[in-house]
Amino acid sequence: VLSELPRTALAVRHFQGREVRCPVPADGELLLRVLYIPLDAASRAWMQGATYRPGLVAGEVMAGLGLAEVVESRSASFQPGDLVCAETGWQTFAVVPAAGLIRLPRLEPLTHLLSVYGVAGLTAYFGLLECARPVQGETLAVSAAAGAVGSIVGQIARIRGCRTVGIAGGASKCAWLVRELGFDAALDYKTGTLADDLRRTCQIGR
């Protein structure tokens, strides 16, 4: 559980493990065994108050998505062994409504269901292709390019024929963007010359 709302940096004291009786699903519900949870930056924002969801409350299970396996089903739409992504919170077992959930394929590795095919991947895909709508040949600068969303944005942009310039903190992250992910260039914002570097690399004003 989230035992205390943090006012500064997160620490072990803000969380507490508890053992409780395993919940029992009612009609239309599923008992899930949580396999993986993502540690997203959004989780920290929820601790600071209401965002796109209500703020968290101390003493309750830490909120969050979970990739889970159905243990017991009280819904005709799911069977034990099915995989789903649901609002499970940070716990080993959770009971959730079956309505609105979809059965997921068993990919390898399973963690891709929470990353590339999860919220980060969907945010990158629709944010880039439906909102930004870059055109082939354009230069696209990606902030937080070494993060979950930014790293996927850059790769999709490259596939769509854009020149991609990533912005990240530190030489190692910048090297990873270029060598491993195929970014055309990467800028280290920690150098203190980001504005000049961005103008030069993206040829702004030419």
Regions found by a protein language model. Name each.
Residues 2-8, 37-39:
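Short polar catalytic/cofactor-binding loops
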Residues 118-197:
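Mid-domain Rossmann-like dinucleotide-binding core that forms the NAD(H)/NADP(H) cofactor-binding site
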Residues 9-21, 50:
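Short glycine/threonine/proline-enriched tight-turn/helix- or strand-capping micro-motif at secondary-structure
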Residues 62-69, 80-144:
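NAD(P)H dinucleotide-binding glycine-rich loop of Rossmann-like/cofactor-binding domains
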Residues 1, 70, 81-84, 164-168:
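Short, hydrophobic beta-strand segments that form beta-sheet elements in well-ordered domains
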Residues 201-206:
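A glycine-rich helix->loop->beta "capping" turn
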Residues 21-39, 47-90:
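Glycine-rich beta-strand-centered segment in the early N-terminal region that forms part
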Residues 10-12, 43-47, 148:
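Short, glycine/acidic-enriched capping/hinge loops at junctions between secondary-structure elements
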